[in-house]
Design a protein with these regions (language model features):
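Conserved acetyl-CoA-binding loop-helix of GNAT-fold acetyltransferases
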Residues: 82-96
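Conserved small/polar residues in nucleotide/adenosyl-binding loops
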Residues: 137-139
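Conserved beta-strand in the GNAT
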Residues: 48, 54-62, 68-75
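A short, internal acetyl-CoA/4′-phosphopantetheine-binding micro-motif in the GNAT/acyltransferase core
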Residues: 74-81, 108-109
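A short helix-loop-beta-strand connector motif used in the catalytic cores of GNAT acetyltransferases and
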Residues: 38-48
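Short amphipathic alpha-helix that is part of the acyltransferase structural core
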Residues: 1-34
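Conserved GNAT acetyl-CoA-binding A-motif
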Residues: 97-115, 119
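Conserved acetyl-CoA-binding loop of GNAT-fold acetyltransferases
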Residues: 123, 128-134
Length: 139
């Protein structure tokens, strides 16, 4: 049984401490205090994807307004990566969020490191398979 749950501050703290340092490079990880402040102000929405009562994946969004969310962090727990959990979670989130525009950002595959470029291309392909469209905006 799989469910999507909106997360509270306590759950955000737990995920941050248990999973996020492994899943994201230090330079990309916001301080927990910043996320909590945004959540208190209603500008940060956090969701967990649970399978059989255990966390399988999580997604954190910055809320621009009632119709637009920026996907800030998205990850599957290490033991479940590569098993379709991320795709299932995105589909379930789409149903829960009901027509909200979700924006995501990915790094372009323009590094001098071939391995890094391969990972970036896999990430882009994953989001495209999930229904995201690649824009021509480069920042």
């Amino acid at each position: 049984m799989s469910t999507v749950r909106k997360l509270n501050e306590s759950a955000l703290r737990g995920i941050y401490d248990a999973y996020m340092h492994e899943a994201f490079p230090p330079a990309e990880l916001k301080p927990l205090a910043v996320m909590l402040r945004l959540m208190e102000r209603g500008r940060y929405l956090c969701y967990g994807y649970y399978r059989n009562g255990r966390l399988a994946a999580y997604a954190f969004f910055y809320r621009h307004d009632s119709r637009v969310l920026l996907l800030d962090y998205f990850a599957v727990t290490p033991e479940l990566r590569g098993r379709g959990v991320g795709s299932a979670f995105l589909a379930a989130l789409d149903a829960v969020l009901g027509g909200v525009c979700i924006l995501g950002e990915v790094e372009m595959p323009d590094s001098h490191d071939a391995g890094l470029n391969a990972m970036r291309l896999r990430r882009i392909a994953f989001y495209e398979r999930a229904g995201f469209s690649l824009s021509l905006i480069h920042i």
